[in-house]
Amino acid sequence: MARLGNCSLTWAALIILLLPGSLEECGHISVSAPIVHLGDPITASCIIKQNCSHLDPEPQILWRLGAELQPGGRQQRLSDGTQESIITLPHLNHTQAFLSCCLNWGNSLQILDQVELRAGYPPAIPHNLSCLMNLTTSSLICQWEPGPETHLPTSFTLKSFKSRGNCQTQGDSILDCVPKDGQSHCCIPRKHLLLYQNMGIWVQAENALGTSMSPQLCLDPMDVVKLEPPMLRTMDPSPEAAPPQAGCLQLCWEPWQPGLHINQKCELRHKPQRGEASWALVGPLPLEALQYELCGLLPATAYTLQIRCIRWPLPGHWSDWSPSLELRTTERAPTVRLDTWWRQRQLDPRTVQLFWKPVPLEEDSGRIQGYVVSWRPSGQAGAILPLCNTTELSCTFHLPSEAQEVALVAYNSAGTSRPTPVVFSESRGPALTRLHAMARDPHSLWVGWEPPNPWPQGYVIEWGLGPPSASNSNKTWRMEQNGRATGFLLKENIRPFQLYEIIVTPLYQDTMGPSQHVYAYSQEMAPSHAPELHLKHIGKTWAQLEWVPEPPELGKSPLTHYTIFWTNAQNQSFSAILNASSRGFVLHGLEPASLYHIHLMAASQAGATNSTVLTLMTLTPEGSELHIILGLFGLLLLLTCLCGTAWLCCSPNRKNPLWPSVPDPAHSSLGSWVPTIMEEDAFQLPGLGTPPITKLTVLEEDEKKPVPWESHNSSETCGLPTLVQTYVLQGDPRAVSTQPQSQSGTSDQVLYGQLLGSPTSPGPGHYLRCDSTQPLLAGLTPSPKSYENLWFQASPLGTLVTPAPSQEDDCVFGPLLNFPLLQGIRVHGMEALGSF
């Protein structure tokens, strides 16, 4: 990389040398001020000389600040032929940058000239000027705070002069003291000082934007003397001197030699090494005293000590704290009260287990190194037999048969505590009653009782884990000195969810009462497990579940309720809350052939526990049931269709719009009146001739005219008669015509006969012949013949029925009676027509 950089620089220098006339000699930059306030505007101009013949006649001058091109340059040609570009930077926000005047040369910018711009602030006034006279170096050291950063090279100078007064009159000047770069302190040597005479001192700060001076300080160098701290050490023990008292330290120090001729005072500070205690200040120490006994300290405790001094009573400065000295105080005999309790073994009553607890009588009761249980035999003055020496809070020993009392003491290197007598007596006092216990929180138990009569002097309370973890060696006990107490809150060695045995014994003068015990849980636990679910019965949409409740557990809170949860395959959850006495539950509303996950939660006031998950699937519907359901559905659909059809058929206003009422001769009931072929010959009634034709109507065939019964404006159309008659074909109905019939749409006339009569009025019947152009049903039919009334052959009375006068002009009777070319009509009565 270094070689590559050197080659690049070499090529750049070579290219510049090869440029014609050297472009760098063509331009020159001038600025309004190279150093300005940060954020102030600055104006610069660049002039290109006329003798740069290798440039364009009108070169474009560009400006660049650092690496960024700056727009806004104003370019013009001067009278002497030179090109000038002027730019104004409104805000110079760079503390240091290069402004360049450039031209486009090829594909790159060629710098014609550049100038360095600086921006910053004028120096602030130096403050907190202070000076100290160091006797070790014999120099006056002054220091100050320079103020905020100026971003410009700033020089500081410590100036001073001598003065015989209060520095109002300036005397001889003292050589300026210039600190090193970056330092804010300076030393004036002793040769430039005049001791015991005032001098004026100040600091001057200067940079390119201005100058500032600190307030003047007037002082005597000896008034600002700072001494060096003395050397602190412990006092050597002397055979004649008494040993130091407990909690005391004997100290001495060696003063600083150059300051022996200066009057001074000192002070001491100390703190214990253990913990995070703060310094405690002791002083001032006695004048001209080089040793001191420091008391009131904790015994058998390590301390850290330091000392410092100051010129006194004249002005001066405190010295620094001396190096630390570590000392340990002496011990004191334990000052404690020992609360004792004892228990005899059942198998060996002379084996006694003694317990005790030290109770400090003072804030500093002394360190305890161990305990001694001793017995003084009667009749042996001064003889003490130790029974037990231990550092524990209990001891098991064999009690001599004649011993009824032992002594217990605590000891350390400084001595022993006051002996505590322990009297072994039988339980002859009254017992307390109604002992009870309850948990206050997971880490405490409240034990209460009713005191006996007379009041005891105190109580001994023991507690420890109950069965099956009971152990006499792990019991905790304490003594309650208040004989009128009715309860006590146990906080020591209490853990949650544990069964504890609590024993309370009343203490009397020279005796004690019988012990009473009670069991209690520090905190009841939630059920350890929930009952297991079992499937009893299951159907398509239901499932019957059952479970066996768990038996009550010691230390477990009683159940308050059950909650059963079931979840389907779509992860939809359902739940139901049941009483604690429930033994089963039926799930309803299940989906057939569906998978469900079910679990039971047993809850109490202490918490809840879930059972294992039971997975079941409901039954699938059988095939017969499915067929029944489909059959019922089909029957219902059929009934619906039938009802709809009947409704449409029975309602004329619904039927007529769907299809027209066009008669069908082939399926008409008229066809049943006359057989299709008559085997017998037609006979005529004797004595009767051809009935006269009373009226003939000729109908012309016209497709554009409506049928006669559909026309409402024809004068020939009238209402239907009260009695409908029949048409009779005159002639032999079996005769077959050999004449071909014209096709439909011709002008051939078809003759119709109309028989008019009335059942109520006797008289001869009337025939009505009509000419019709209506097309026949058959393609080719024989020509119409005369009509013969066959009614006379079937009439039992042999009389003719005459038509009603109002029916003589009727020729059209509706769509059911207008059938062309009927072979024969046999009237069997009016009842047949009534069915129409």
From Swiss-Prot:
Residues with attached carbohydrate: N51, N93, N128, N134, N389, N474, N579, N610
GO cellular component terms, semicolon-separated: endocytic vesicle membrane; external side of plasma membrane; extracellular region; lysosomal membrane; plasma membrane; receptor complex
Extracellular face of the membrane: 25-627
UniProt entry tagged with the keyword Membrane: yes
Disulfide bonding pattern of the chain: C26-C52, C46-C101, C131-C142, C167-C218, C177-C186, C248-C295, C266-C309
Signal peptide positions (record): 1-24
Cytoplasmic face residues: 651-836
GO biological process, one term: signal transduction
Effect of R308C: In SCN7; decreases localization to plasma membrane; decreases receptor signaling
Chief localization: membrane
Keywords: Cell adhesion, Cell membrane, Disease variant, Disulfide bond, Glycoprotein, Immunoglobulin domain, Membrane, Receptor, Repeat, Secreted, Signal, Transmembrane, Transmembrane helix
GO MF term list: cytokine binding; cytokine receptor activity; granulocyte colony-stimulating factor binding; signaling receptor activity
Superkingdom of this protein's organism: Eukaryota
Domain notes: The WSXWS motif appears to be necessary for proper protein folding and thereby efficient intracellular transport and cell-surface receptor binding.
Biological role: Receptor for granulocyte colony-stimulating factor (CSF3), essential for granulocytic maturation. Plays a crucial role in the proliferation, differentiation and survival of cells along the neutrophilic lineage. In addition it may function in some adhesion or recognition events at the cell surface.
Listed name of the protein: Granulocyte colony-stimulating factor receptor
Organism: Homo sapiens (Human)
